[in-house]
């Protein structure tokens, strides 16, 4: 359709004269318009054919861009670069994140120790070179799945392994630091409190028993800690160094503000060695000149005394106080007994014992003869006066005599004797009827006019 330029009447394209006003249309203009419309239609067809190709090309460009973006952040080389940058920049939080596993959480302080250990024991330049070479070889290898970076001394410091793929195209590299167990072996039951894996941790170790305190990645550690024992609470550090271990464990050195006490006794020569005790802060312990007592906190005073027995009597020293300001890691102290008082008492008791022993020697000499006579004559009356009537021993001997089962004895020797009120305990060495030497313990009662009678006996 076209419009008459004179009257505006609509007419078909092939009409030459306007039916309204008689205006004659220009045939060349119609031809041009027809040609132009055909060109536009042709161009539209071409454009419609090009759109899918353009879209495809655009998507391809996007895929290529996305691939390179993913490659920059997910290729083995990119993963390596992330770890290297974190170590180079002392980014302990990033290193902690990269090294943490489900089984072993690494905190930032542990990562800080690890970074320093790498720089000291491998060297940053060497570490970066070893890491890149290791990743490259693993990435190219069809068989190898893991390898270790080592220190100059040959200790493993980082495990690099393949762990599946990322986005189909890239090997996923896993970086894991090997761990060891630091171990403690306290002299007494001890509770340790410290921070590990970003959390507070408590470990209770029994006396003289090897106890691990956790799993740690390589490093030289000085961990702030508190420890508690029966002697008190201590502030200090747990120290351990991976360079000092070639096994799965590493010994812990304790560095706490503590004092150990060495005790020397004077004036104690007359005391029984087994009876000597040391009391520190109200806690009594056996004494040994070679023993070190403790540890004790250095921030509190210590009270100390000693005791011991001689002839059944307990003697004590004066109680001394060691001020906190005088406490050192190794602290020596001397405690003095009143040797003159002890010697006077021992001398007095020895005289009494000699008198008692003489009485017992006389008594058991007569008793052994009476015992043997009762056996030979089957007559309890021979021995009855030596045994207290009504006692279980009296009835037992009487029964044995009647049955002919009484044992003959000879050569009694008094080994030891003690008197407590009217009761006497004596250890007597005898020869039995089989010719064997036996020690028996007798209990006697001292009655009126110092008369002695047996009330009990037992094998020593």
From Swiss-Prot:
Protein's membrane topology: Single-pass membrane protein
Ranges in the Extracellular compartment?
71-460
Q: Which GO terms describe its molecular function?
A: zinc ion binding
InterPro entries cross-referenced by the UniProt entry:
Mem_prot_TcaA (IPR023599), TcaA_2nd (IPR054529), TcaA_4th (IPR054530)
What are the subcellular locations of this protein? Cell membrane
Q: What is its main location?
A: membrane
Q: Where are the zinc fingers (C4-type)?
A: 4-21
- A GO BP entry: response to antibiotic
The cellular component terms of Gene Ontology attached to this UniProt record, alphabetical and capped at eight, are:
plasma membrane
Do the record's keywords include Cell membrane? yes
Keywords from the UniProt entry: Antibiotic resistance, Cell membrane, Membrane, Metal-binding, Transmembrane, Transmembrane helix, Zinc, Zinc-finger
Task: Specify the superkingdom.
Answer: Bacteria
Under Pfam families, the record lists: TcaA_2nd, TcaA_3rd_4th, TcaA_5th
The segments annotated as topological domain Cytoplasmic are: 1-49
Give me the segments passing through the membrane: 50-70
Task: Extract the signal peptide range.
Answer: none
Briefly, what is this protein's role? Plays a major role in decreasing resistance to glycopeptide antibiotics.
In terms of PANTHER family, this protein maps to: MEMBRANE-ASSOCIATED PROTEIN TCAA
Q: Which family does it belong to?
A: Belongs to the TcaA family.
Name listed for the protein in its UniProt record: Membrane-associated protein TcaA
Please name the source species.
Staphylococcus aureus (strain ED98)
Organism lineage:
Bacteria, Bacillati, Bacillota, Bacilli, Bacillales
């Amino acid at each position: 359709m076209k419009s008459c330029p004179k009257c505006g009447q609509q007419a078909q394209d092939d009409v030459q004269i306007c039916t309204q006003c008689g205006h004659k249309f220009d045939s060349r203009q119609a031809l041009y318009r027809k040609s132009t419309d055909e060109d536009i239609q042709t161009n539209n067809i071409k454009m419609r054919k090009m759109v899918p190709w353009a879209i495809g090309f655009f998507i391809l460009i996007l895929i290529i861009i996305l691939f390179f973006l993913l490659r920059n952040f997910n290729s083995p080389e990119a993963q390596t670069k992330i770890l290297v940058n974190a170590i180079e920049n002392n980014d302990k939080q990033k290193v902690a994140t990269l090294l943490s596993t489900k089984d072993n959480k690494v905190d930032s302080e542990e990562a800080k120790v690890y970074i320093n250990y790498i720089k000291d024991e491998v060297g940053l330049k060497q570490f970066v070179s070893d890491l890149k070479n290791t990743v490259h070889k693993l990435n190219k290898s069809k068989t190898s799945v893991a390898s270790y970076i080592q220190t100059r001394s040959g200790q493993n410091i980082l495990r690099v392994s393949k762990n599946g793929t990322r986005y189909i195209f890239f090997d996923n590299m896993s970086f894991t630091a090997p761990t060891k167990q630091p171990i403690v072996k306290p002299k007494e039951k001890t509770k340790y409190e410290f921070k590990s894996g970003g959390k507070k941790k408590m470990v209770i170790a029994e006396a003289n028993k090897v106890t691990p305190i956790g799993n740690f990645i390589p490093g030289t550690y000085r961990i702030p800690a508190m420890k508690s024992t029966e002697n008190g609470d201590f502030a200090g550090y747990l120290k351990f160094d991976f360079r000092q271990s070639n096994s799965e464990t590493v010994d812990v050195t304790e560095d706490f503000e503590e004092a150990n006490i060495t005790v020397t006794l004077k004036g104690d020569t007359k005391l029984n060695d087994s009876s000597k005790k040391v009391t520190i802060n109200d806690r009594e312990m056996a004494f040994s000149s070679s023993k070190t007592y403790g540890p004790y906190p250095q921030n509190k005073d210590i009270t100390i005394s000693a005791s011991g027995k001689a002839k059944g009597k307990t003697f004590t020293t004066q109680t001394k106080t060691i001020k906190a300001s005088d406490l050192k890691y190794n602290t020596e102290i001397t405690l003095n007994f009143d040797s003159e008082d002890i010697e006077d008492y021992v001398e007095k008791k020895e005289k009494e014992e000699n008198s008692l022993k003489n009485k017992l020697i006389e008594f058991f000499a007569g008793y052994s003869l009476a015992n043997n006579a009762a056996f030979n004559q089957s007559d309890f009356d021979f021995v009855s006066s030596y045994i207290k009537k009504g006692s279980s021993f009296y009835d037992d001997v009487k029964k044995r005599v009647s049955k002919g089962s009484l044992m003959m004895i000879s050569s009694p020797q008094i080994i030891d004797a003690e008197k407590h009120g009217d009761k006497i305990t004596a250890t007597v060495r005898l020869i039995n009827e089989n010719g064997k030497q036996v020690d028996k313990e007798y209990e006697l009662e001292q009655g009126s006019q110092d008369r002695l009678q047996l009330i009990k006996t037992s094998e020593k």
